[in-house]
């Protein structure tokens, strides 16, 4: 191959569009929240008219609606709000691990097959079709988070509403997150994502006093 042709081929390869997976559920009035939490609502605050050149919505929602990032403040008073946390955990190489039909908790044995050369972020796919329902879902065993912490991960994500069961009062898995300084994403949609390694982009909003933030989470193929 001549030098100009080689340069063109290299440039074409670099310019190839990498595939993106949108792993966020839609946000609207059908979005489920923890029983008693603030439901999503939306209305027009300003409306296009002869005296108004724009539409502007007013939106009310819990910061735990849809795909979201919990801040340490969510499970420990005096800890950091979501607008104060480091953004680095929410951006970079990650691994999607399939632990389908594993029951009420993701145990260490369910992820043991995928721990070699682990990148710093792990997303767990527990169901064939993600659901935001609080009625029944898979959470993460504290022992699983403790194991992942030994692998030097910085973030864990899951395709269910919470890393703890809905009825939990002491939130042992959230406490493991706090103990090991791990960040967390909940309510992801991993239905169409093969097991493997990706780039994660899921930045929270800079909400300076909030205990969580919605994210628009995506995965991008590495090459």
Curated annotation (Swiss-Prot):
<dbReference type="GO" id="GO:0019441">
    <property type="term" value="P:L-tryptophan catabolic process to kynurenine"/>
</dbReference>
<dbReference type="GO" id="GO:0004061">
    <property type="term" value="F:arylformamidase activity"/>
</dbReference>
<dbReference type="InterPro" id="IPR007325">
    <property type="entry name" value="KFase/CYL"/>
</dbReference>
<feature type="binding site">
    <location>
        <position position="186"/>
    </location>
    <ligand>
        <name>Zn(2+) 1</name>
    </ligand>
</feature>
<comment type="function">
    <text>Catalyzes the hydrolysis of N-formyl-L-kynurenine to L-kynurenine, the second step in the kynurenine pathway of tryptophan degradation.</text>
</comment>
<comment type="similarity">
    <text>Belongs to the Cyclase 1 superfamily. KynB family.</text>
</comment>
<feature type="binding site">
    <location>
        <position position="64"/>
    </location>
    <ligand>
        <name>Zn(2+) 1</name>
    </ligand>
</feature>
<feature type="binding site">
    <location>
        <position position="70"/>
    </location>
    <ligand>
        <name>Zn(2+) 1</name>
    </ligand>
</feature>
<dbReference type="InterPro" id="IPR037175">
    <property type="entry name" value="KFase_sf"/>
</dbReference>
<keyword id="KW-0823">Tryptophan catabolism</keyword>
<keyword id="KW-0378">Hydrolase</keyword>
<keyword id="KW-0862">Zinc</keyword>
<dbReference type="GO" id="GO:0043420">
    <property type="term" value="P:anthranilate metabolic process"/>
</dbReference>
<feature type="binding site">
    <location>
        <position position="68"/>
    </location>
    <ligand>
        <name>Zn(2+) 1</name>
    </ligand>
</feature>
<dbReference type="Pfam" id="PF04199">
    <property type="entry name" value="Cyclase"/>
</dbReference>
<comment type="subunit">
    <text>Homodimer.</text>
</comment>
<feature type="binding site">
    <location>
        <position position="34"/>
    </location>
    <ligand>
        <name>substrate</name>
    </ligand>
</feature>
<dbReference type="InterPro" id="IPR017484">
    <property type="entry name" value="Kynurenine_formamidase_bac"/>
</dbReference>
<keyword id="KW-0479">Metal-binding</keyword>
<feature type="binding site">
    <location>
        <position position="70"/>
    </location>
    <ligand>
        <name>Zn(2+) 2</name>
    </ligand>
</feature>
<dbReference type="GO" id="GO:0008270">
    <property type="term" value="F:zinc ion binding"/>
</dbReference>
<protein>
    <recommendedName>
        <fullName>Kynurenine formamidase</fullName>
        <ecNumber>3.5.1.9</ecNumber>
    </recommendedName>
</protein>
<comment type="pathway">
    <text>Amino-acid degradation; L-tryptophan degradation via kynurenine pathway; L-kynurenine from L-tryptophan: step 2/2.</text>
</comment>
<feature type="binding site">
    <location>
        <position position="174"/>
    </location>
    <ligand>
        <name>Zn(2+) 2</name>
    </ligand>
</feature>
<feature type="binding site">
    <location>
        <position position="186"/>
    </location>
    <ligand>
        <name>Zn(2+) 2</name>
    </ligand>
</feature>
<feature type="active site" description="Proton donor/acceptor">
    <location>
        <position position="74"/>
    </location>
</feature>
<dbReference type="GO" id="GO:0004328">
    <property type="term" value="F:formamidase activity"/>
</dbReference>
């Amino acid at each position: 191959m001549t030098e100009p042709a080689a340069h063109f081929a290299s440039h074409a390869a670099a310019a190839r569009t990498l595939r993106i997976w949108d792993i966020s559920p839609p946000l609207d009035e059908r979005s489920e929240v923890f029983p008693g939490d603030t439901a999503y609502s939306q209305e027009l605050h300003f409306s296009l008219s002869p005296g108004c050149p724009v539409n502007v919505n007013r939106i009310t929602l819990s910061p735990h609606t849809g795909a979201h990032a919990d801040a340490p403040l969510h499970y420990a008073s005096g800890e950091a709000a979501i607008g104060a946390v480091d953004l680095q955990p929410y951006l970079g190489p990650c691994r999607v691990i399939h632990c389908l039909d594993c029951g009420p908790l993701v145990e260490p044995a369910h992820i043991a097959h995928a721990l070699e050369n682990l990148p710093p972020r792990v997303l767990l796919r527990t169901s064939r079709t993600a659901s935001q329902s609080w009625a029944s879902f898979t959470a993460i065993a504290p022992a699983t988070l403790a194991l992942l912490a030994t692998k030097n991960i910085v973030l864990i994500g899951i395709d269910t509403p919470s890393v703890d069961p809905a009825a939990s009062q002491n939130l042992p898995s959230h406490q493991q997150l706090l103990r090991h300084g791990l960040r967390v994403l909940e309510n992801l949609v991993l239905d169409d994502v093969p097991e493997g390694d990706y780039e994660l982009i899921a930045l929270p909003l800079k909400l300076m006093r909030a205990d969580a933030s919605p994210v628009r989470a995506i995965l991008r193929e590495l090459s």
